[in-house]
């Protein structure tokens, strides 16, 4: 019986990766696999979602998962759910690892690897993904790119104290 379930998941995953219909066909196929998906969700072409345990993934209303993203919820015997909250945006080619919660209105930049949860309305980027800005307007239907960019507020890094060996010679 487990082999039949695995075959079904792999077959539906393959179909969802290749067929058109980012808000219709792909969403329906992933739901059939067991992924919990809200309304108004966009799933980009060639996206891979946890093959062995799709039931560990939740994508809430209005979220966007860009093309060629990978969402994993387990490694061997390590199983942790992944949740993508309302209006979150996962950029193309991003990788989300087990146990991550992407907060409401959060944005993951293209190509980022997310190893820790992302707070609501925060933009992260890099490998591993780090917070770089606060998001005023998440990039969803009806939001112009210019308005999204204008809404970003950089997160300033805390300045660290200079140690004695780093102070300039001759300064007082």
Regions found by a protein language model. Name each.
Residues 14, 82-90, 95-96, 127-172:
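C-terminal segments of enzyme domains that contribute to small-molecule binding surfaces
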Residues 30-31, 35-37, 41-125, 129-131:
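Structural signal for interior beta-strand "rungs" in well-ordered beta-sheet cores
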């Amino acid at each position: 019986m487990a082999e039949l379930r695995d075959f079904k998941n792999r077959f539906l995953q393959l179909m969802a990766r290749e067929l058109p219909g980012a808000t219709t066909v792909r969403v329906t196929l992933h739901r059939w696999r067991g992924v919990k998906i809200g309304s108004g969700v966009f799933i980009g072409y060639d996206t891979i979602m946890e093959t062995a345990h799709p039931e560990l993934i939740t994508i809430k209303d209005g979220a966007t998962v860009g093309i060629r993203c990978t969402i994993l919820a387990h490694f061997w015997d390590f199983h942790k759910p992944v949740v993508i909250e309302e209006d979150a945006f996962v950029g193309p080619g991003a990788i989300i690892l087990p146990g991550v919660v992407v907060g409401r209105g959060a944005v993951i930049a293209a190509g980022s690897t997310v190893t820790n949860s992302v707070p609501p309305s925060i933009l992260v980027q890099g490998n591993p993904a780090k917070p770089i800005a606060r998001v005023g307007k998440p990039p969803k239907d009806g939001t112009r790119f210019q308005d999204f960019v204008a809404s970003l507020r950089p997160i300033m890094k805390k300045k660290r104290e200079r140690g004695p060996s780093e102070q300039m010679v001759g300064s007082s």
